[in-house]
Amino acid sequence: MHKHDPDGTRLPIKIDSTSNGEYEPIPISALNEQANHLALQQAEQNSRRLQQTRRKFLISSCGAASTLLAFNQANAYAGKRGGYFDLHPDAGLDRFAAAEQLEGNEFIFDVQGHYVNPEGDWLGQLPESARPYAQMEKASCEAASEPGSRAYLNCLSADEFIKDVFLDSDTDIMVLSFVPSTREREPVTIEDADATRQIVADLQGSKRLMIHGRVNPNQEGDLEAMDELAANWDISAFKTYTQYGPGGVGFFLHDEAGIAMIERAQRLGVRNICVHKGLPFGPQSYEHSQCSDIGIVAKRFPDMNFLVYHSGFVATVQEQAFAAGAGRDGIDTLIQSLIDNAVAPNANVYAELGSSWRFLMRDPDNAAHALGKLFRYVGEDNVLWGTDSIWYGSPQDQIQAFRSFQISQEFQDRFGYPVITPGMRRKVFGLNAARPYGISEEEIRLHTAVDSVAQRKTNYLNDPQPSFLTYGPRNRREFLNFLNWGG
């Protein structure tokens, strides 16, 4: 019995307008709409040929392959030549061909995950009549029918988080990160994050969840709070937002506040600084969302790691081949900063793909330029896997799309981009992040292969129930409501 979408109207690869709440949702293009329509048509045809219901077909590897092949067809018809999903033409019908290209045993370490505590203190700051997140797709899950005016928040529970991330996807480890906020307005606090980590750990002690410590050094009390975060919460990095601050004014990492944060982290023995760059919140303090400061601090602090979350990607910028000195926005601000400060590829700057890859899945030309430039200038050892889930629902569709995406031969020849090899995919999926986060893949595999999450997944896959739903806002009204709730 299918608990979710019994009629099979939801595609397993989710190309839609959902945002992570840090930027206003951007509608998908007419081409994306056509591709989604074609994918549903082909799902209907292929499910009939295989004598399956459309829902049963769509939750299979063939369903994902059929969807990606439909995207290829629509993109090719529109003249998109930069990249494609490298799948056998029969993968939409042949489960072995689909499995060969969309299933895998890579070590997958998602360095950017999010969780909202449905019972957190933040609810007490809202009017009793408020129904935060009620309009999100995910709020329509089965748990929403339980008693209580806010029962739908159970759809955001730790159990649902575990299902989306560890049962419905191939993710092995995730880092819980934080949204920009003050301590008083955090939708998930350090205590919430630790409690969620403990829920997973209690399943059998495996280290499947790690956490960041949120700090904005231009905010009163945040610098001093770093000591307590490092001492008491076993954090793996400090996470900061340079476009965020009092009165909407941000900071640069090489400003006094930024340097104070880096030096304090250094003294505390926390070598990872995770910084949101790109995906600007709006026009105010826009320059602080760009990456000009990254190369400066990377050169000044060679013993520190700077993990650039979103890689400086700007959704409204069409990525193209890098041109030194052209002053282009987006990922090029990161590349230019590295070049200006003689920071070599595969040094102490890392480019993370959360939200960026999800958006790049819309346009294979954009994806080819973005990935090609990151591999070339940041280094194939320093590109990190992140998905920004739960906002985009289960990250499995992002995993499947990345497993199969390839830069075209034309773009390789014209722009010097590399072919994406299986070895490079393994690096991006987890091996690259294992270094700054101090994780041994072998150790993690040893624990996660036999822990209770793995056992639950084995049982779950006998009757999988992926929802193919998202959590984040999908339009301006939902986005503004999200901001009002402290998102």
Regions found by a protein language model. Give the residues of each.
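Active-site environment of divalent metal-dependent phosphoester hydrolases
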Residues: V116-E119, S181-E184, N218-G221, G245-G247, ...
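N-terminal twin-arginine translocation
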Residues: L38-I59, T67-R95
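N-terminal secretory signal peptides
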Residues: M1-Q52
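Mid-to-C-terminal alpha-helical segments outside catalytic/metal-binding sites
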Residues: Q51-L69, D94-A99, F107, L123, ...
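Catalytic pocket-lining loop regions of alpha/beta-barrel enzymes
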Residues: S236-A237, G247-W385, E410-V419, F468-G486
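Active-site gating/metal-coordination segments in enzymes
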Residues: P89-G92, I173, F178-S289
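Alpha-helical scaffold segments that flank or form the walls of functional sites
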Residues: E106, G124-L203
